[in-house]
Amino acid sequence: MRKSFDDLTIADDFMFCKVMQNEGICKEFLEMVLSNKIGKIAYLSPQNSVAAGIEAKSIRLDVFVKNEDGKSYDIEMQVSNEYNLPKRMRYYQAAIDIAFLDKGEHYKALNDSYIIFVCLFDAIGKGKPLYTFENICIEDGQTPLRDGTKKVIINAQAFRKAENKELKGFLEYVKTGTVNTEYTGR
């Protein structure tokens, strides 16, 4: 059964993509989640498919933007837990890298990238509102690989535990529909 427009929430794919097409909202979201200023952004792919090859599984990106430094950000809304998010993020990263590195180009040409999933559930199961991952040396637990990739899983279910007021308000809005910050009121 299809929902009417008035019944859509930010968690609905259509509405999430429409809201994130507002450059100010999308930029502020990224800065809030990553705790960094990211500069001007440009949209690369509003809900476009990316295929790694003719017979490869394609992916459909909800929101795909790049900042003025060349970093790319894939933002996805995930409503149901299919228990495959880490591997799905891995595949998305690989498909994006393949799609944006042309034959003959050096690997150095790969831009830094972030894969961000906003989830209505706790995909990792540790009760945190935000999980940020990058490749780290197992032997010393601190040396980064510096491959330019980060993966972020946002758990709207844990909105009460978010320390940043704006992030807490956004997560509560995603989970419950309650508007209580300037950001979510836009």
What residue spans do the PLM features occupy?
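Elongated, amphipathic alpha-helical interaction scaffolds
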Residues: 1-186
